[in-house]
From Swiss-Prot:
It comes from Salmonella typhimurium (strain SL1344). This is Trehalose-phosphate phosphatase. SUPFAM superfamilies: HAD-like. Pathway: Glycan biosynthesis; trehalose biosynthesis. It is an enzyme of class 3 (hydrolase). Belongs to the trehalose phosphatase family. Substrate binds at D20, L21, D22. One of its GO terms (molecular function) is magnesium ion binding. Its cofactor is Mg(2+). Keywords: Hydrolase, Magnesium, Metal-binding.
Amino acid sequence: MAEPLTVSPELTANYAYFFDLDGTLAEIKPHPDQVVVPHKILQLLDRLAAHNAGALALISGRSMTELDALAKPFRFPLAGVHGAERRDINGKTHIVRLPEAVVREVEALLRSTLVALPGTELESKGMAFALHYRQAPEHEAALLALAQHVTQHWPQLALQLGKCVVEIKPKGTNKGEAIAAFMQEAPFAGRIPVFVGDDLTDEAGFGVVNHAGGISVKVGVGATQAAWRLESVPDVWRWLEQINYPQQEQQVMNNRRDGYESFSRSI
């Protein structure tokens, strides 16, 4: 059972930070295009990266192109599409590709099927596909059955469940493998990994971080193998503030003991 996260890592410690985006750094919206990461949060991430030799990466189901757009004007190491594409600290990209015929056939099948499922949405990511049903939860079972059919017919693909989404991605790619790859490279190598995420897609990352003796943090409710928990996206934002400004947080704790309003509720 994950414990509430009440102690922030010391800014001077030897950590490598990994953050999911949707539901972790940004509030989930009805449509992915509506999601925004507040500029202040991006500044905190950039500051945290600077204090850790650049050892901070975004790990997401989104494409790297989307992640860069959401992180502007900052540029971080990234793992997109659950690790199917990755960019290291030097800007070198590592991309898992599928045969063009497979991508074409799968996309055609998905598009033709979703026509009969109003309210659902297909997001094509090149080497992966996301079947969204946030606006049509009654079609969850149908999308799951469709994804299972696809992964059975094309064994190089695997199914990944998420919040109001069923994803089809290259087999063997997940956020845990992406984090493990970063941890083999400078500036991440030799550091203690910290991973913050909110979804089923983040569980593989929690497993890798736990095995490495790091800090795994689940955002929100639900069963998890993460060791720690933050209740909401605003709690993640406050936690980032605490990490970046530990002296300010100490003053907050002193004020709390003196009976003043606390900076934030216990997280």
